[in-house]
């Protein structure tokens, strides 16, 4: 009888542990397992911080990299360095039970360092707009905040569906997206930004380049002759002013030089869908300018 009761007790403990453990696949295709909901999370990228808040885990983020400035509460999170150079001693002192890294912009050395802490590491790198709500759901599972994550994911998917319905059949607009001016670099078809552009009916003039964020020349942009040029408005980013001297470019002739908020387009977090809507609006302006000529 005692042996039977002991067996039942052990079975119950094993079942409980199995139910508590959660495993998801990260964007590197690796399994990430937490034995219980993560309560102390470290974010190694600004877009990751936004994803964690969107998943209902903002109060659980105990450390974040510089420029993690959204939502407002994120500004008060202790800093651990930059996405390329973290202070590993600060990370250790925070005693995290989950670390979320940026798959391509956090260096391999940094990821190896945090792995050696024995803490589960989720590598984040959303490649499409659809993967943003999916990322929210997976992070919500790891933190045990599924209800909040599901609500956010549902809303994001609804917004995406609305944009697709609105712009699915719009005429294409050949577009140059300028990330920085010195050096002049852009984003290729391998980036999530191009997925957003396609949703709007935009065609990235550097879609076929193999590098995600290639440096390009002014001459190559002039030769491609884009119908629209989009740059970002951050303090240290180059604007569209440099193109005004090139009157032969279609974007200049048609007054299709646009400036958007880079935080909404260069971070693969929930707000990127808002940024996509803004991009769609300016590309629609370009179509109207085309019709008016």
Q: Where in this protein do the model-derived segments appear?
A:
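Bacterial N-terminal signal peptides
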Residues: 5-16
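N-terminal hydrophobic or amphipathic helices and topogenic motifs
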Residues: 19-39
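Extracytoplasmic substrate-binding proteins
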Residues: 24, 30-31, 97-98, 102, ...
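A short, structured surface patch at a secondary-structure boundary
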Residues: 39-94, 98-104, 205
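Short secondary-structure boundary segments
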Residues: 45, 103-104, 179, 209, ...
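His/Asp/Glu-enriched short active-site or ligand-binding loop at hydrolase and phosphoryl-transfer sites
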Residues: 65, 190-213, 233, 258-259
């Amino acid at each position: 009888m005692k042996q039977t009761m002991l067996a039942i007790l052990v079975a119950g403990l094993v079942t409980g542990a199995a139910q508590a453990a959660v495993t998801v696949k990260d964007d590197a295709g690796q399994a990430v397992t937490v034995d219980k909901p993560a309560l102390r999370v470290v974010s190694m990228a600004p877009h990751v911080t936004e994803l964690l808040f969107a998943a209902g885990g903002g109060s659980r983020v105990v450390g974040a990299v510089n420029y993690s400035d959204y939502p407002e509460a994120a500004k008060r999170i202790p800093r651990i360095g930059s996405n390329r150079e973290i202070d590993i001693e600060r990370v250790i002192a925070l005693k995290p039970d989950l670390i979320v890294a940026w798959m391509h912009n956090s260096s391999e050395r940094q990821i190896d360092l945090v792995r050696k802490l024995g803490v589960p590491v989720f590598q984040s790198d959303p490649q499409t707009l659809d993967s943003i709500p999916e990322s929210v759901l997976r992070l919500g599972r790891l933190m045990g905040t599924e209800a909040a994550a599901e609500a956010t994911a549902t809303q994001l998917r609804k917004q995406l569906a609305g944009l697709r319905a609105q712009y699915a059949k719009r005429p294409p607009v050949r577009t140059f997206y300028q990330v920085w001016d010195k050096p002049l670099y852009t984003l290729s078809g391998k980036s999530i930004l191009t997925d957003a552009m396609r949703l709007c009916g935009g065609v990235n003039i550097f879609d076929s380049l193999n590098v995600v964020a290639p440096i390009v020349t002014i001459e190559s942009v002039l030769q491609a002759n884009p119908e629209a040029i989009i740059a970002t408005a951050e303090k240290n980013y180059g604007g569209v002013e440099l193109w005004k001297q090139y009157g032969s470019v279609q974007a200049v002739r048609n007054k299709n030089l646009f400036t958007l908020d880079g935080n909404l387009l260069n971070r693969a977090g929930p707000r990127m869908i808002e940024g996509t809507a803004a991009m769609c609006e300016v590309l629609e302006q370009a179509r109207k300018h085309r019709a008016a000529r």
